[in-house]
């Protein structure tokens, strides 16, 4: 596991030496809250950011971090994958993602293998883990996303996801609707998030505002 994370990080750091064959991008965002599959991760405002290296071959690597309110207050993820097109309107993506909590117990960290296929504006995907967060057993997450432009300045997105797991405490359906636009070089996103569960950390008719900047 450590070797794979090191390899992903090393490939990302080497991006400067392969600028002719790769595109490097970054992002930073401030959100009024951070939800992951319908579960609150930050208990309030969250600062996040990351960067990606995309190669001409379709291979990519990246890392992403966010403030959270558990496991020492920091989530640090590493990922690598491959994406391509089957036709002008059909594309696919497969990869590996490691969820790290460097200031918390290593037993809380976990990995997933993911895949998706997109048909025009719609995407269907999945994520599989054989040992989910805090060693709670296997999990399967499937989702459907659909988005489209509203005129020239706005876009509207819809999301539905379903989580099944050995630990029933992790199981839920999550839903969201998001309205996005850009202003003064910033991305603005207002999302409504809900889940099939009530109470605890599960989303219950929440609204989240995110301001982001691509680098």
Predicted regions and their residues:
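Outer-membrane beta-barrel proteins
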Residues: 2-11, 15-215
């Amino acid at each position: 596991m450590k070797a794979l994370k090191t390899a992903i990080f090393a490939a990302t750091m080497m991006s400067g030496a392969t600028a002719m064959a790769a595109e490097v991008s970054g992002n930073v965002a401030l959100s009024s809250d951070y939800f992951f599959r319908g579960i609150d991760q930050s208990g309030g405002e969250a600062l996040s950011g990351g960067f990606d290296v995309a190669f001409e071959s379709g291979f990519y690597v990246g890392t992403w971090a966010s403030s959270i309110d558990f496991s020492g207050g920091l989530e640090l993820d590493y990922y690598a994958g491959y994406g391509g097109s089957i036709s002008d309107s059909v594309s696919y993506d497969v990869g590996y993602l490691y969820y790290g909590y460097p200031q918390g117990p290593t037993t809380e960290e976990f990995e997933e293998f993911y895949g998706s296929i997109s048909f025009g504006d719609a995407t269907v995907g999945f994520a599989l883990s054989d040992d989910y967060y805090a060693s709670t057993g296997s999990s399967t997450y499937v989702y459907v996303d659909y988005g489209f432009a509203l005129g020239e300045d706005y876009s509207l997105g819809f999301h539905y996801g379903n989580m099944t797991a050995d630990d029933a405490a992790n199981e839920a359906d999550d839903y969201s609707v998001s309205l996005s636009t850009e202003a003064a070089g910033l991305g603005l996103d207002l999302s409504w998030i809900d889940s099939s569960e009530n109470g605890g950390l599960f989303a219950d008719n929440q609204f989240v505002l995110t301001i982001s900047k691509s680098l």
